[in-house]
């Protein structure tokens, strides 16, 4: 028997919680980070004996924010910010990141939090097979393919779309790019249709740039687009925090320029961002809370 409750973008199944990344990230950024990023807490977290106790306390507080009594939090539906994930892993929070698609009803990859590898989305789920369409799956990203009894038979009355999605050997083509390590852990790079090409043909994954940018000061969310041979980052600022700091339009623009410069020290030269443009409204999203990227590529 499965008992579940649905609230917003979280769902509880038995004693686990399923959530989209946006919900987790907002809780951590708004409720947790401000409490641990002062000088005193930073000092305590660098003292080995005390650090363990402090992290246990932080983990308890984060767990209580989700009700306290659960086996694990399963995160999926969109890319998970690496800064937030690294924090959750460092304090021992019981989470895992899964991967799936409606066409697979919906689970493709999953791993119990006890064996989960940070940065991955788990391994092929029970009865599923997953492979990377690449000559070197561990190092060269390729399309993620899935096969198993839960893969759909096809799209209703759309044979052409079905043939484009499921090949003659029964492999479902996800449209996502990723790698797989020797233990079968899958690491998603981004959507194949989102991939950009650098000036010399390098593959650029905008989701990876956005993940780093979203961890910088006053950035609520972002979309990286290509204009000619330049990469432009559209940023929706954290206006609440900016107001708390009493920052005006000019100061906010200065912060974003500083962010751009810092970002470019964190990424390869061929994927450097030339400009950050402030986007006043929140980006439109799908029901899974993924940004509708196609709406902003023409800006």
Residue positions per predicted region:
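Short Gly/Pro-enriched turn/cap motifs at secondary-structure boundaries
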Residues: 119-124, 169
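Conserved ATP-binding/catalytic segment of the ANL
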Residues: 131, 138-198, 215
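C-terminal boundary motif of the adenylate-forming
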Residues: 177, 215-239, 264
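Gly/Ser/Thr-rich phosphate-binding loop
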Residues: 16-18, 30-116, 129, 220
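Single conserved hydrophobic/aromatic residue that forms the stacking wall/gate
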Residues: 1-8, 13
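Conserved C-terminal "lid"/linker of ANL adenylate-forming enzymes
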Residues: 221, 229, 261-299
